[in-house]
Amino acid sequence: MDPVAIENVTPEIECGRFPAKIVVNSKFTVTAEVFRAGHDLVYPVLMYRKLKKRWRSVAMKGTGNDLYEASFTPDEPGIYEYKISAWKDSYGTLIRNINAWLGSNEDVEQDLIEAINLIKDAYKRSSGNDKKIIKRYLDDLINSDLNKKVMILNDNNFSSIIKKYQKKIDKTDYRTLRLIADPEYGGYGSWYELFPRSIGNFNDIIKHLNYVKSMNFNVLYLTPIHPIGITNRRGKNGSRISDKNDPGSPWAIGNDSGGHYSINSDLGSLEDFKNLLRSAREKNIMIAMDIALQCSPDHPYVRDHPEWFYHRPDGSIRYAENPPKKYYDIYPLNFETKNKMALWNEMKNIFLYWISNGVKIFRVDNPHTKPLDFWEWLINDIKRDHPDVVFLSEAFTRENLMFELSKRGFTMSYTYFTWKLTKGEITEYFKKLYSYPYNFFFRPMLFTNTPDILGRDLSMGRNEFIIRSVLASTLSSLWGIYSGFELCENDRLDDTEEYLNSEKYEIKRRNFNSDNNIKDIIARLNSIRDEMPALRSGKIKFCETDNDKIIAYARYNNENKILVVLNLDTMNVQSGFIRVPLNDFSMDLNSIYDVHDVLNNNHYKWSGEYNYVRLIPGKRQAHIMVIKNA
């Protein structure tokens, strides 16, 4: 039986079953309702530590209605633990009562003696500089008049020291919870995806880094770099018929020259790859590696470990299936095979091998088709020794399954952003993602396009590419584009979401200086993201507008306040009034304030909540405004 109630602790993911997440060097705030019967005060503290290190504590502050909060800041990546302990606040209760009795002209002589006894008791438990401070105050108390005694007893600094050492009567502990502190690139990143073979080889990609950097991307994501299978190789646009010139899908991994530990010889050697990693780091670009845990029919695993695959009634190995389609160039692995731990350990070793060669970011293909307990085991095991490694879940599946993968360990996740087009759809979706508890375990990665997905809205041309860029880069701290987006490529295969002449099945040579590109806009968006802390870690508030073709939302934190206003119409000028969330900005409703549109480099003077905007497609599609007091 617990004499102190500790309830509604946040964040707490599924009663502590899963850890919360934060980015290193970010303040982590814990709140809880803490109370006890009667009129006695409680003294709750937040205990925290990095796993296996010494516990630290910070007193929780009351914010009203039995709600308390406290914070700590993880200063390095890794697993942390936190919990709340609380006990009767004997000293605080007594001082509160003394103040009340004095206000009613009651005699408090015996109560002052009791207070001094509590201080003497705390003195015995104290140490170091705290002991010296208590001794000094105690001497003053004994030799002071009533008014001076009351002033000393109410001194906040002195009180906090006494409460720290007072006897912990009715001490109650809440269960221990976990927190994952990820490196900054696990929570903030601007990604550029490319097919290495379309650039040439690793040395050619090194030369291409300046192009990626010119748009201010800080993560270069490479599609699989392994040998590609020959058997049942797919041809142009995914055709089952191929010829000798078809390079095949990079996701059909493995041939006679090796599998997941090997590099396609057309791209270069392992040393060439490591040189790419070094060259990218020199430009403050990280390399993200694509890991697809599946095999071509030519993968060495098929020969050496046929028991790792699914078998049909006739004994043949089952191809990958996603009804109504079958993928004859890929064999899925059976993660529930009889001796599954041999397979699981081999899969873990693949990640560990590339980690040993310098990779810290993994984009994992189709994780939702593998067991949840496999991912929880693998990621937790890897991050225990490599807390600076992060995992992106490429799962376009049921929402609950996407959330569960993040709970089980994935650092960040693809989203439904591609299919959220209207003001209502965008608002509803991101309100959910930024609400509790999702905001403590699910980090949305907003890709504008992928090799598999050419959004139907992008058929509307350049202005729509700008719209999606602004949305993706400002709605989340994580966003990315697949190569060609900056060139506004939108040739579609029939009435599908697939690209015509898909790069998945052919080598594509691009003119990266073609007309009609939006490279400068993307570069500016990424630059703004780097400059504005609120776009990296701020809260979000969707704003009222009187025009459904205009969406507006604020991103804000203690460092800056951003207002994004966007015309969702690619063809027509749209105008209207937006309601600036001045209350959320801690600004007076009658404020006059400076507005700097950092996207278009314009300055305005606004006043009050409601202000007028006029957005012109092709000229001024959006505002990204920094709000400052005049």
Swiss-Prot record:
The keyword Transferase applies. Disulfide bonds: none annotated. It catalyses: alpha-maltose 1-phosphate + [(1->4)-alpha-D-glucosyl](n) = [(1->4)-alpha-D-glucosyl](n+2) + phosphate. The record marks 452 as: Transition state stabilizer. The keyword Glycosyltransferase applies. The active site is at 365 (nucleophile), 394 (proton donor). Its EC number is 2.4.99.16. Keywords: Carbohydrate metabolism, Glycosyltransferase, Transferase. It comes from the Archaea. GO terms for molecular function: hexosyltransferase activity; hydrolase activity, hydrolyzing O-glycosyl compounds. Alpha-maltose 1-phosphate binds at residues 234, 294, 329, 366, 504-505. InterPro entries: GlgE, GLGE_C, GlgE_dom_N/S, Glyco_hydro_13_cat_dom, Glyco_hydro_b, Glycoside_hydrolase_SF, Ig-like_fold. GO terms for biological process: alpha-glucan biosynthetic process. It is an enzyme of class 2 (transferase). PANTHER family: ALPHA-1,4-GLUCAN:MALTOSE-1-PHOSPHATE MALTOSYLTRANSFERASE, GLYCOSYL HYDROLASE FAMILY 13 CATALYTIC DOMAIN-CONTAINING PROTEIN. Belongs to the glycosyl hydrolase 13 family. GlgE subfamily. Homodimer. Maltosyltransferase that uses maltose 1-phosphate (M1P) as the sugar donor to elongate linear or branched alpha-(1->4)-glucans. Is involved in a branched alpha-glucan biosynthetic pathway from trehalose, together with TreS, Mak and GlgB. This is Alpha-1,4-glucan:maltose-1-phosphate maltosyltransferase. It comes from Picrophilus torridus (strain ATCC 700027 / DSM 9790 / JCM 10055 / NBRC 100828 / KAW 2/3). The lineage of its organism: Archaea, Methanobacteriati, Thermoplasmatota, Thermoplasmata, Thermoplasmatales.
